[in-house]
Design a protein with these regions (language model features):
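C-terminal alpha-helical "lid" subdomain
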Residues: 152, 156, 168-278
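Conserved catalytic segments around the Walker B and adjacent sensor/switch elements
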Residues: 43-56
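Conserved NTP-binding/hydrolysis module of P-loop NTPases
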Residues: 56-76
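Conserved AAA+ ATPase "sensor/coupling" helix adjacent to the nucleotide-binding pocket
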Residues: 69, 140-145, 154-171, 203
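Walker A/P-loop nucleotide-binding motif
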Residues: 18-36
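Sensor-1/coupling segment of RecA-like P-loop NTPase cores
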Residues: 26, 105-141, 145
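N-terminal pre-P-loop "Q-motif" helix
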Residues: 1-12
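Conserved P-loop NTPase "ATPase switch" module shared by AAA+ and STAND
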Residues: 86-110
Length: 278
């Protein structure tokens, strides 16, 4: 899986530097955000203007990303429309790259401006959540010529290895074969789902004396994955640019601390050979 992602990342980087516009399509929790962060860490803003937008739901989010990619452009005291004109001129003079995560609700204004950045002006990669055919059809209505790239899903064997490695690293009680099978079925190839699931499983409320409450963990993980973007909409979107700090970029894609969920099972190691069953 890692090799496949490295190859995809290298391919996307080359295409973005050529000014292509791409849409990374995949289900929620499949790892699109982590891939965009890795791409951001690989690009060198000192020679290639680049910005990463954590949430992209409006034209102003795209404008803010361009402002971060071209910090030398003065957009103070002018209208946002005038600011976009100055930023477009800067991009026309030095092509850059925009990484637009959580891209949704594309308005005609957003699509129109992205069209103006097409044709070698700025490479754009938009990460779009697609979980069903209805969402896929919705993307077709505003794709404006951007090429679609499918986010690869992990095999069952790859997911099982990740699940067991994370469970051991986080100090979770041993998971029996039936529990693993149910979690892998719910994950449906999504690496990010397994990461979120094991984070949640650190909380004591998901465990009983007979073992983990698998159905509850699966429901809460799915809800958490689907609601994550909605939570982000309530805060100021994170936009990054400037000199890359590789360690920071990696930490942003790493699992968060179990303290976020209160009680932490990692401090309660199971006795040797103990196996929980659902």
């Amino acid at each position: 899986m890692q090799r496949q992602l490295r190859e995809l990342s290298a391919s996307l980087e080359g295409r973005l530097l050529r000014g292509e516009h791409l849409m990374l399509l995949g289900p929620r929790g499949s790892g699109k955000s982590s891939l965009l962060q890795d791409l951001y860490a690989q690009l060198h803003p000192q020679s290639v203007p680049c910005a990463f937008s954590a949430v992209t739901t409006s034209l102003d989010h795209i404008t803010c990303a361009l402002e971060c990619a071209y910090p030398g452009v003065d957009t103070r005291g002018i209208s946002r429309r005038a600011a976009r004109m100055r930023l477009w001129n800067a991009a026309d003079g030095q092509a850059g790259v925009l990484l637009l995560d959580q891209f949704r609700g594309a308005s005609s204004a957003m699509v129109s401006f992205l069209r103006r950045l097409h044709g070698g002006i700025t490479g754009v990669l938009s990460a779009v959540d697609v979980d069903d055919e209805q969402e896929r059809r919705g993307v077709q209505s505003w794709r404006y010529g951007a090429m679609s790239v499918r986010m690869p899903l992990a095999s069952r064997r790859q997911l099982r290895r990740l699940l067991l490695e994370r469970a051991a690293a986080l100090g979770l009680p041993t998971l029996d074969a039936m529990t693993c099978a149910r979690l892998l079925a719910a994950a449906r190839g999504r690496v990010g789902w397994i990461v979120r699931c094991t984070e949640l499983a650190r909380h004591e409320r998901y465990w009983r004396t007979h073992g983990p409450l698998v159905s509850v963990i699966c429901l809460d993980t799915e809800a958490d994955v689907r609601c994550d973007a909605l939570k982000m909409l309530g805060a100021n979107p994170e936009v990054r640019s400037g000199v890359i700090d590789r360690s920071r970029a990696e930490s942003n894609s790493a699992p968060s601390s179990g303290a976020r969920y209160g009680g932490d099972l990692s401090t309660r190691r199971p006795s040797a050979g103990r196996t929980h069953r659902d």
